[in-house]
Amino acid sequence: MSIIYNEKTREFHLYNQEISYIIKILDNDQPGQLYYGKRLTHKEDFSHLFEYAMRDMSPYAFEGNSTFSLENIKQEYPTFGCGDMRFPAYEIERENGSHVVEFVYKEHKIYNGKPKLEGLPATYVESDDEAQTLELVLEDASIGTKIILLYTIYEAFPVITRSVRFECDSDEKITLLSAMSACVDLLDKDYEMIDLAGVWARERHVRRHKLDYGIQSIYSMRGCSSYQFNPFLALARENADEFQGQVYGFSLVYSGNFLAQTEVDNYDTARVLMGIHPNGFKWTLGKGEAFQTPEMVMVYSEAGLNGMSQTFHKLYRTRLARGTWRDKVRPILINSWEAFYFDFDAPKLLGLADAAADLGMELFVLDDGWFGKRDDSTSSLGDWYPNEEKLKGTLKELAEKINAKGLKFGLWIEPEMTNKDSDLYRAHPDWLLAEQGKRICHSRTQYVLDFSKKEVREYIGDMLENLLAEVPVSYIKWDMNRTFSEVFSNGNDREYQGKVCHKYILGVYELYERLTSRFPHVLFESCASGGARFDPGMLYYAPQGWTSDDTDAIERLKIQYGTSMVYPVSCIGSHVSASPNHQTNRVTPIETRADVAYFGTFGYELDLLKLGEEDKAEIRRQIAFMKEKRDLIQKGTFYRLKSPFEGNETAWMIVSEDQKKALVGYYRVMQPVNVGFKRLKLKGLKEDTCYKVSGYDYDCYGDELMQVGMILSDSASGVWKKGVNDKGDFQAKVFEIVAV
C-alpha cells in the first residue's frame, strides 16, 4: 500500500496489491482522473494516459487553445458551469447569484491512517498502518473557500474510500446546492449497472441493465435510504458474473436522502456520482463554517460479483461495524411481534418466555405495545414509559422474571416518531417535521419528529437513557415505520429549511452514538418497517438490521440474496416464523424456514405456545445446530452459487477462513418432474483437501466438488441419491462439509 506523489508530473498514484488509482493535476490546475482498476506497476510518469483533443463545438478553457475542454476530460470532482456539460459533482451559489466557481489545486497531505468524519458514520482503521490517506486541497481564492477531497486506500482490501469537505473562510456566504461524495469517470460505457430495488416486504431485489446514453439513477427523497433503492450500485462488464469478470462497486455510508447515478455522454464515457440528493438540499456556509459529505466506498473486483461482495462483507463486518457486538456471535432470539402483535399481557409474555427457554433460545424481545396506552398503532409513540397495567407491574420486574428463566431481555423502540394521540404531541405539536396549520400526511397513523432539533433529540434521549439505566435490557430493536412527506422545521428560518433532511439524519446518528456509548453491552438492531433503512450508515451503530418484514422463507431467498450483494451475513436479521406465513399466507415446512434463516442472525417470531411436540423437537435441533455453526456463519466467506432471479433454484455457501469447514444452502421452490440430473458446483474449498459431505456415504476432494459438483438429483426427478430429502415444493437442504 502506498500513495506516491510525483512533483514533476503532478501525479498521485494510490495503490496496494490489487488496485491502482491515478490522479493528475491538469493544465487548468484541477484534478483529473487517469486510471482506476487493477494494480499497475508504479512508474514516475503516467501522463500519456491523459488524452484530450479538439472536438467541434466544445467550450475550451484557454484562449487560443482549441484542445483542452472539460466536456471530454475525465475529472475527479467536476464543477458546474465551466465547460463540462455533464452532471456536476457540486454546485455553489454566491451572494451575487453566480454559480460559477473555479477551485484549483493548492496543496496536499499524505499520511498514514484514516480520519474520522465528524458526526457521520464511516469505515475506520484500528492502527494507522492499515491505510493511507490523501487530502487534496482545492481553493477558489476569489470566494475564500476550500474543497478538501479525501481519499483513503486500505492495505488489506481492494478499497478506496472518498468524501469531501467544504471550508468557508470568507465574509461572503456561499450556498451549497449540491455536494456529492465522489465522482468517478470511466473510459468507456461497456458496463451493465446493477442495483438493489424494491418496496415494503420485497426489498433489495437485484436488477441488471446495460448502460445507455444519458442518465440512469437510483435515489431516495424519503428521509431514509428506502425500500425502493439501496445506496449502492455496481458497474460490471457485460461478461462478468458471480465468479469472474471486472466489477466496480460503489456504496454510500449514509442513511438519508441520496442520489446514485451513471451518466453516459456522446463520447461513450461513463460517469458515476453518489452522495446526498440535491433535491431539498441547500446548505449555506458563513466564515469559519464547514460541511462534510458522507463517505463513498469503492470496491474493485477481478473475480466477479462474489469478489466484490466478499470485500464489502469483510470491510463492513470488521471496519464499519463497531463495539462489543462486532465480533461476538449473536444470540438466538424469540420476538413477540408475530406471536401476539399488540394483544398481550404479562402472563402471555412469561408463557412465551418459558417456551423459549425450554427450547434453548437465549434472548426474549418484547416488541411494540409495551408503553404508554399502546394497544394498537394509533397512539402513544413518544411516550416511552411502560404500561404497568398491561404488564402487571414494572418493566424492570418483567425483565428480571425473564432473566430468571435464563433469557436476556430485549425491547422495541421507535424514537423518531409520534402519534397525535400521545402526551408528547399534546405538549409539543411544533415538534412534528411538518408546518403547523397545514395538512399533514400520516402513515401507520404516525408522524415524524423533527430530529434536526436538539431539544427533540435530548427529550427522547433522556427518556430512553433513563429507561435503559433502570431496566436490564440487553438488546434494542430501533424501528422507523414511516418516511418523510411535508418537510418543515417549525421555528426555524428559511435558510435552515434546506438543511433539515441532512440535519435530521445527523440527529439520528447523534442519538445512536449517545445510547450505544452509554450502554456498550446492549446489542442494537436497526429496523425501518423492515428494510427501508438497511444501509451502511446504520451498520456503524447497529451491527445487525431487520432485513425485511417479510418473513416468508421463499420470499426471503430473493431478499437475502440481493442483500448479500453488499452486506455481510452477520448483519442480516432472519427469523423462523409461522406457517401459513403472515405476509404471504404460504405454507412451508419448518425445516425450510430454518434452512433459509440460518444464513443470517437467526431467531424465531411465532407463538411457540401453539406448537406441537414434533415442531418443538425440530426447533431444538435447529437451535443446537445454529449454536454449533454460528461462528462459521457470522465470520466465514460467503458465496452466491445460484440466483433465485434466474430460475427455480437458489444456492449459497459459507466457507471458514481456513477452508476446513463449509455450509451449503440449497433451495428449490417448485418440484419439477422427470428432469435431468442435477449438480451444484461449490466454491472456496481447497482443491487437494478431502471433504466429507453430510448425507453422502463417500468423500470428495475439493476439486471434484468445485469442478464436477455435488449431486442433487432426487426421486421425483427419476433417480434417488442421498443428498436431498424428497419434500416436493419449497424444498431446502443445508449440507455440512468438513475436511477429513
Give the role of each language-model region.
Residues 5, 10-13, 21, 31-263, ...:
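Polysaccharide-binding surfaces and accessory modules of carbohydrate-active proteins
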Residues 18, 164, 288, 334, ...:
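Conserved, mostly hydrophobic/aromatic
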Residues 71-117, 242-257, 299-324, 361-368, ...:
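Glycine-rich, aromatic-flanked loop segments that form ligand/cofactor-binding clefts
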Residues 100-105, 283-302, 730-737:
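Short Pro-Gly-centered flexible turn/kink motifs
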Residues 242, 644-686:
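Carbohydrate-binding surface patches
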Residues 325-461, 475:
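Aromatic-lined carbohydrate-binding/catalytic grooves of carbohydrate-active enzymes
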Residues 392-394, 426-428, 432-587, 601, ...:
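Active-site neighborhood of glycoside hydrolase catalytic domains
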Residues 670-740:
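C-terminal beta-sandwich/jelly-roll accessory domains of carbohydrate-active enzymes
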